[in-house]
Amino acid sequence: MSVQADDPLEPFYFEHEEQEICGKLVAPITDSFQEDYPSVVDRFFTRYYYFKGDVPYQVLYHSNRICLICLAPEHPALAQGISSVNFDIGNVDRSQNVVKGKGKKGGMILQAESTLALLTTANGGTYKVPSCIRGKLVEVNTAIVEEPKLLEQLPEGAGYFAILLPKIENCDAIKASLLTQEQYEERLKSKNEGLPQIESTGDHAQNKNKEIQA
């Protein structure tokens, strides 16, 4: 690695020193770098999708039940440019949500169709971001209020709106109400080809989630 002469970090840059073990040279640690190493999302989350009308949202479902609510990569706001995010939706401010202890007591209970945040775009458009699943609101990502462009810039999963925690007994029903990655891609393909689309969770799942008991 080339560095400037006055670089204060120069003493800390990695420099390989040849090492021999059992008559064989040990390869430098940089040789073990995998450019295609699975991302955090690929390793620990399952991707699901929720449609509000024709607008897609992503639910990243962790093995411990924690769910990250995000914009799907094809959400139109990402192409339009995001100008603001607000968790004060009028009758309640989601950012004032407070949970306590390991049991996350006190958090707001949200329905799939509950408005989680308001998003405005550079062209003046407004989107009511849905909660996508029924669950307890654990926290909201206030960083995207201060820097809305993070939703466009951060890698998958990092630019989330909120963390929700569904009840264990509701997990199977919630997963069934969402689209899998394969179903999502099939829906997008059908839309592009003008074919009948897989029922969106904005219609199908909202009714199904209402049947799930709190």
Swiss-Prot record:
GO terms for molecular function: actin filament binding; actin monomer binding. One of its GO terms (cellular component) is filopodium tip. Residues 189-214 are annotated as: Disordered. It holds the Pfam family GCV_H. One of its GO terms (biological process) is dendrite morphogenesis. Residues 201-214 have a biased composition (Basic and acidic residues). Disulfide bonds: none annotated. Belongs to the ABITRAM family. May regulate actin polymerization. This is Protein Abitram. It comes from Drosophila melanogaster (Fruit fly).
